[in-house]
């Protein structure tokens, strides 16, 4: 987890912070400076069209050609972030890598190029970050905002107020994927356009009612497709930069009349966006019609700006992941006193064995702390196999602030806190798998130590960690006088043997 570590250092202490957005259509880099008030000043913006989503085959494998396009772009970006310390750069990947079955190969190679971890984020986490970027880039309208962001492989919808998002959705429709499906040869016909529009309307049917129930006072569009539409409509004399149904209708007629992406020489549409513009326009028209929008304004802020503000928040002790963990505890009625006891003991043990077991990264501490607090959420489902229920809830929930990998690791930590440690699944994390086994052992020790749930004062113990063993020394005579704890640790020694560790208790 060396790449995943994040120093405990305020963002304003870094000369620069950076956000990389590995999108399905384009890769973007933002370099910025943060001040002590949490404000972010953008110093440099870079973007390259990569069209990663176009490289996905029918089996959802990313082609080597698309992989090389992405890596070549990242090599150029790497020059800008060379030497920047861990924790000052955050790299997020979206729909194309969410979908790619061979994403681990791309991620490994990308991390070698960048020297920083790549996080594949869920659609709803992407939506949360988009809203954060929009909210920090526009004046507060005083009411609810509906934010829409048409990406290369997915489209996100968020309703929020102020800086807080209330509803987040992500749909599998994007300007690159729809181009591949409906406009592959560049020809724009009314029939093809209608197919793309209808497909988007069908996707929207699943979320229309939930969006309408919450309501909004202002509709905002983010990212390149909506920006290009707004600029083209303004250049055509149909408004002052806002998007309206009339403006959309005019632009649609214009695009259909031209009939080919090579002829889309319209002001506001960059040459490298022409091929994907008709698909994006069809999706946007479907959004307007489905939600009966009268107007949409464009925001310059989007995902990468949201990543920067989220990065600043993490360093200023406003980590949204902490709120997510607290929400899980409340939703699933976790006993807060027991969770606190287990967390305190687990972190104390980590401090004692961290050097010997190479568990010194901040992420190790975070995972252990979170795991201790939510390890019992499965009890709200049933006691039988509650560790499996808890792991399932964590793996399959939308956890704001968590990357997919962090979420999977937390799920496995909860799964492994009792009975069998899922060594086969932990091994999927390659070199980090053994460290996750060690984190499981630390958490299991803390839980065993407080098996009696605070009804008895527990003694101080001495710990000694070696590469494949943990020795625990209780005060003389204490174990004999407490046979339940003695039996617990004897059984634990048997479980740990199955993953190649010995537990020596005396």
Curated annotation (Swiss-Prot):
One of its GO terms (cellular component) is plasma membrane. It is found in: Cell membrane. Keywords: Cell membrane, Hydrolase, Membrane. GO terms for biological process: polyphosphate catabolic process. It is a peripheral membrane protein. Its cofactor is Mg(2+). It catalyses: [phosphate](n) + H2O = [phosphate](n-1) + phosphate + H(+). GO terms for molecular function: exopolyphosphatase activity. NCBIfam families: exo_poly_only (TIGR03706). Belongs to the GppA/Ppx family. PANTHER family: EXOPOLYPHOSPHATASE. Homodimer. This is Exopolyphosphatase. It comes from Pseudomonas aeruginosa. The gene is ppx.
